């Protein structure tokens, strides 16, 4: 594997490992500092909101100043965020840590996505994005496990560990990452508003809407999953860990071994539509499942559809972006963060109304995504006929 690709994958893995580390440790912080569930919600939302605001600037600056520089700045911010959380003893410090962490993700994500697109041959781009999505998934899987294990020693240890990894990733990036000779900055040599008018914004409307809608539905489901299974079939933390880990492993395997093969036979939009329909069917089965093993088995396969959609959308963004890979990566990260910010807030309120309501929400959002894809496919077909 190309050394640069390996380092980029490591950086992405680090960011999402750091996000996952927080999950088992935050309740301990809440108890120590006397914080409430609302405070926990604010800490989670602060990260997503910060990433959402910073991502478009991170993407544009990556195109202008170089993706390596933006990635390195993001990694330094990541380490600062983790060390702040490790030493924090009041809510204000923890909140500032999460804001800085969101800024870090908002710089690293578009920088890495754009650089992978730049250095990947066209025939390997879909495969490399599939690997990237699998690595993101792996970070989410391993993060809570590592965080929970280290918390047995000290609930602050996971954050020191993540901060140290950030420094290591920064050093590796300085030494091993090089911006490609061919620049993808045309139109962004100066950060002037009128230059944005040169972008064909209509091209990005459908992927932006899809990204927002799908991240909203997916985050709503994933955020409430542990509470849902605990209330429905009395899953213990161990059961939930097995279900999430199993689902994550299956999702990662499909991304690594099957995603690029599917991309040879389907367009991104067609593949996204079929993945959404698969997810709808599995979510409906989850609603009707009431036994321990039936829900466990469904949990192993429920994430496959969502995990296949992520790299498909990333690849779709890349293919329509042309020489604006950093800009497209910034848009992708921005609207993913927006969905990750809004989804859990809505799902939490719905869960208080009815235990199945967040699942219904995810089903409705997935069906809406299918409709959006079909409308876009018809629109493209008409444009193709007009150009013939």
From Swiss-Prot:
Provide this UniProt record's keywords sorted from A to Z: Cell membrane, Membrane, Transmembrane, Transmembrane helix, Transport
Q: GO CC annotations?
A: plasma membrane
Which CDD domains does the protein's record reference? MFS_MdtG_SLC18_like (cd17325)
Gene3D superfamilies (UniProt xref): MFS general substrate transporter like domains
Is Transmembrane one of the keywords? yes
Which compartments is it annotated to reside in? Cell membrane
Highest rank taxon of the organism:
Bacteria
Family to which the UniProt record says this protein belongs: Belongs to the major facilitator superfamily. TCR/Tet family.
Q: What does this protein do?
A: Involved in quinolone resistance. May constitute a membrane-associated active efflux pump of hydrophilic quinolones.
Q: What is this protein called?
A: Quinolone resistance protein NorA
What organism is listed for this UniProt entry? Staphylococcus aureus (strain MSSA476)
């Amino acid at each position: 594997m190309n050394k640069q690709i390996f380092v980029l994958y490591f950086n992405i893995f680090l960011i999402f490992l750091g996000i996952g580390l927080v999950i088992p440790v935050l309740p301990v912080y809440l108890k120590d500092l006397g914080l409430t569930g609302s405070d926990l919600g604010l800490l989670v939302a602060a990260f997503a909101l910060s990433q959402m605001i910073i991502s478009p600037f991170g993407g544009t600056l990556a195109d202008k100043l170089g993706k390596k520089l933006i990635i390195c700045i993001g990694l330094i911010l990541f380490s600062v965020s983790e060390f702040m959380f490790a030493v924090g003893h009041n809510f204000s410090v923890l909140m500032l840590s999460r804001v800085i962490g969101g800024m870090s993700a908002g710089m690293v994500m578009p920088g890495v996505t754009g650089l992978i697109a730049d250095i990947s041959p066209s025939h390997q781009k879909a495969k490399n994005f599939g690997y990237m999505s699998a690595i993101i998934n792996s970070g989410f899987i391993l993060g809570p496990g590592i965080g929970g294990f280290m918390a047995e020693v000290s609930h602050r240890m996971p954050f020191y560990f993540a901060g140290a990894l950030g420094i290591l990733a920064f050093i590796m990036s300085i030494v091993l990452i090089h911006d490609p000779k061919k620049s993808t900055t045309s139109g962004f040599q100066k950060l002037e508003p009128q230059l944005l008018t040169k972008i064909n914004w209509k091209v990005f409307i459908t992927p932006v809407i899809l990204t927002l809608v799908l991240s909203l539905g997916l985050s709503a489901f994933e955020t409430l999953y542990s509470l849902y299974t605990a209330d429905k079939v009395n899953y213990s933390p161990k059961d939930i860990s097995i279900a999430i880990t199993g689902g994550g492993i299956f999702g990662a395997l499909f991304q690594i071994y099957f995603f690029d093969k599917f991309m040879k036979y389907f367009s991104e939009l067609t593949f996204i539509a079929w993945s959404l329909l698969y997810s709808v069917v599995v979510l409906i089965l989850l609603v009707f499942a009431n036994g321990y093993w039936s829900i466990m088995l469904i949990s192993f396969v429920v994430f496959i559809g969502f995990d296949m959609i992520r790299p498909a959308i990333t690849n779709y963004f890349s293919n329509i972006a042309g020489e604006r890979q950093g800009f497209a990566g910034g848009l992708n990260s921005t609207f993913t963060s927006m969905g990750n910010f809004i989804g859990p807030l809505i799902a939490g309120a719905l869960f208080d109304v009815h235990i199945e309501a967040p699942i219904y929400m995810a089903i409705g959002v997935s069906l809406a995504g299918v409709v959006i894809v079909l409308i876009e496919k018809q629109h493209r077909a008409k444009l193709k006929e007009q150009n013939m």
